[in-house]
Amino acid sequence: MPVRVIVDSSACLPTHVAEDLDITVINLHVMNNGEERSTSGLSSLELAASYARQLERGGDDGVLALHISKELSSTWSAAVTAAAVFDDDSVRVVDTSSLGMAVGAAAMAAARMAKDGASLQECYDIAVDTLKRSETWIYLHRIDEIWKSGRISTATAMVSTALATRPIMRFNGGRMEIAAKTRTQSKAFAKLVELAQIRADGEPVFIAIGQNEAREAAKQLEELLRNALPEGSSFMSVDIDPTLAVHSGPGAVSVSAVFANQAPELSTGKAGAK
């Protein structure tokens, strides 16, 4: 049996894609307290049970686990604890430093290799390589939810509210940072297209556009990206997972991209030699 690939629901993988590639998706937790909602990561017990089930299916080939950034959730540390239960490194946990379809794309790449008979190490390597070539941006229609979750400071939230700005966030080293501040959705989308176009550097791109209660806006952004990016680029539409939607709020639109090459700041001699 091939290597088994596991993600949590923050990867935003569409159900049909996960089923086609035989990727196991474990749901993160959303808790409702009246009008307030919060999220929690997976426990080591939950993860160990899931890994054990997949090891039974895959035999000696092992399990590759990709989870939300350790900077954003306790899930990664729980995964490392759960993996240590099993002998001989049969469960490998990828330190993704990301979320959304950047993680989803890495899982897809690993699962395709697994279907072709690749080893656990080979699946791990392609997942890491895919993540190094990826970027994730998210346009926030409003900042209330992300401020409440502690992902941005009170000062930043106050300035954004006072100036009526709609930020574009970027994931860097597993943490969220502001990539750009815009006044309107149309300007934000133009900026997102510019960021993706510059980073693509004339090479085809894999793009996954996520949305939370913003389906028409996501379609508009996809059309802009299709017109701007090189021929041969591929596109996928996904829903932002409910656990991420708690923090991004309604109207959020995300862009996860996998590029042909690593960004200059991520390039190393080892990567270039592969």
UniProtKB/Swiss-Prot annotation:
<feature type="binding site">
    <location>
        <position position="39"/>
    </location>
    <ligand>
        <name>hexadecanoate</name>
    </ligand>
</feature>
<keyword id="KW-0446">Lipid-binding</keyword>
<dbReference type="GO" id="GO:0008289">
    <property type="term" value="F:lipid binding"/>
</dbReference>
<comment type="function">
    <text>Binds long-chain fatty acids, such as palmitate, and may play a role in lipid transport or fatty acid metabolism.</text>
</comment>
<feature type="binding site">
    <location>
        <position position="73"/>
    </location>
    <ligand>
        <name>hexadecanoate</name>
    </ligand>
</feature>
<dbReference type="InterPro" id="IPR043168">
    <property type="entry name" value="DegV_C"/>
</dbReference>
<dbReference type="Pfam" id="PF02645">
    <property type="entry name" value="DegV"/>
</dbReference>
<dbReference type="InterPro" id="IPR003797">
    <property type="entry name" value="DegV"/>
</dbReference>
<comment type="subunit">
    <text>Monomer.</text>
</comment>
<dbReference type="InterPro" id="IPR050270">
    <property type="entry name" value="DegV_domain_contain"/>
</dbReference>
<feature type="domain" description="DegV">
    <location>
        <begin position="3"/>
        <end position="259"/>
    </location>
</feature>
<protein>
    <recommendedName>
        <fullName>DegV domain-containing protein Cgl2349/cg2579</fullName>
    </recommendedName>
</protein>
